[in-house]
Structures are given as C-alpha cells and as structure tokens.
UniProtKB/Swiss-Prot annotation:
<keyword id="KW-0560">Oxidoreductase</keyword>
<dbReference type="InterPro" id="IPR050532">
    <property type="entry name" value="Globin-like_OT"/>
</dbReference>
<keyword id="KW-0963">Cytoplasm</keyword>
<feature type="binding site" description="proximal binding residue">
    <location>
        <position position="96"/>
    </location>
    <ligand>
        <name>heme b</name>
    </ligand>
</feature>
<dbReference type="GO" id="GO:0005344">
    <property type="term" value="F:oxygen carrier activity"/>
</dbReference>
<feature type="binding site" description="distal binding residue; reversible">
    <location>
        <position position="64"/>
    </location>
    <ligand>
        <name>heme b</name>
    </ligand>
</feature>
<comment type="function">
    <text>Monomeric globin with a bis-histidyl six-coordinate heme-iron atom through which it can bind dioxygen, carbon monoxide and nitric oxide. Could help transport oxygen and increase its availability to the metabolically active neuronal tissues, though its low quantity in tissues as well as its high affinity for dioxygen, which may limit its oxygen-releasing ability, argue against it. The ferrous/deoxygenated form exhibits a nitrite reductase activity and it could produce nitric oxide which in turn inhibits cellular respiration in response to hypoxia.</text>
</comment>
<dbReference type="GO" id="GO:0001666">
    <property type="term" value="P:response to hypoxia"/>
</dbReference>
<dbReference type="GO" id="GO:0098809">
    <property type="term" value="F:nitrite reductase activity"/>
</dbReference>
<keyword id="KW-1015">Disulfide bond</keyword>
<dbReference type="GO" id="GO:0005829">
    <property type="term" value="C:cytosol"/>
</dbReference>
<dbReference type="GO" id="GO:0071456">
    <property type="term" value="P:cellular response to hypoxia"/>
</dbReference>
<dbReference type="InterPro" id="IPR009050">
    <property type="entry name" value="Globin-like_sf"/>
</dbReference>
<dbReference type="Pfam" id="PF00042">
    <property type="entry name" value="Globin"/>
</dbReference>
<keyword id="KW-0496">Mitochondrion</keyword>
<dbReference type="GO" id="GO:0015671">
    <property type="term" value="P:oxygen transport"/>
</dbReference>
<keyword id="KW-0479">Metal-binding</keyword>
Length: 151
C-alpha cells in the first residue's frame, strides 16, 4: 500500500486541529445530511434524537465527535506507520459493527470528512491535498473493515 503524502496531511490537519469540535460538528452535520438513516444509531441513555440538530447539541454526542477527531489525529500522527494502528482500528470496526453501522456507511463518512476539510481549508484544500486525505482515509477504513470480518 502506498502511503499518503504525509506533509500535505500534517499541514492541513494543523489548521483543522485548532478547532476540532467545531470542524467535527461540520463533518457530522454533513454526514446526517447525506445519510439521515444513521441518526437512530446514536442513542445515549436510551434517548432517541429527534433531529440532527438535537443530536449535534447533545453533550454525549459532542464527546463522540471529540473521540472521532482524536482517531483522525492519531492517523495523522502515524501517517507514515499506519500499521501501528491496525489492531486499534480493527477494534473500532468491531465496535461500530456491534452498534449497527454498515461498512458501506464509511464511504459517506469519507465524503463528509472531505467536505469538512474543504470548508475548513478553503483554497488551501488543493486536489493534491484531497487525494492525500482520500488515500489516508481509505487506509483507515481498510484497517477498520477487518473488524467486520472478525479478524
């Protein structure tokens, strides 16, 4: 597997990581726009959210956003040695499968990630940066997908 362009990823992530909760909220708002059927998967204390806005303002869901952004941060930190995260990512895959997330939904998450990066970076989100992030995200999903196969 060819590694993504590490410096493009690190440079762009520096900007995003200044406000991870804000940018993570953009990512999830886009995700719920593209795939509203995911909303019912997010329940905390048996509470079902009535709208994406309700979910996105929940303290429990904001914690989930923080965790997702930390996983992305770990991938950026280890961009040149993603194999060091393989077991962790496979475990995340198992957790997502257990709560009913379909592997196919990670394609929509990827689209939402690219959307968030474009909104955050503006003109600095070049085609090369997009390609690097697509490659990194693809490698992360490949590792997480091992959790669906029970490996």
């Amino acid at each position: 597997m060819e590694l993504p362009e590490p410096e493009l990823i690190r440079q762009s992530w520096r900007e995003v990581s200044r406000s991870p909760l804000e940018h993570g909220t953009v990512l999830f708002a886009r995700l719920f726009d593209l795939e509203p059927d995911l909303l019912p998967l997010f329940q905390y204390n048996c509470r079902q959210f009535s709208s994406p806005e309700d979910c996105l303002s929940s303290p429990e869901f904001l914690d989930h956003i923080r965790k997702v952004m930390l996983v992305i941060d770990a991938a950026v930190t280890n961009v040149e040695d993603l194999s060091s995260l393989e077991e962790y990512l496979a475990g995340l895959g198992r957790k997502h499968r257990a709560v009913g997330v379909k592997l196919s939904s990670f394609s929509t998450v990827g689209e939402s990630l690219l959307y968030m990066l474009e909104k955050c970076l503006g003109p600095a989100f070049t085609p090369a940066t997009r390609a690097a992030w697509s490659q990194l995200y693809g490698a992360v999903v490949q590792a997480m997908s091992r959790g669906w196969g029970g490996e």
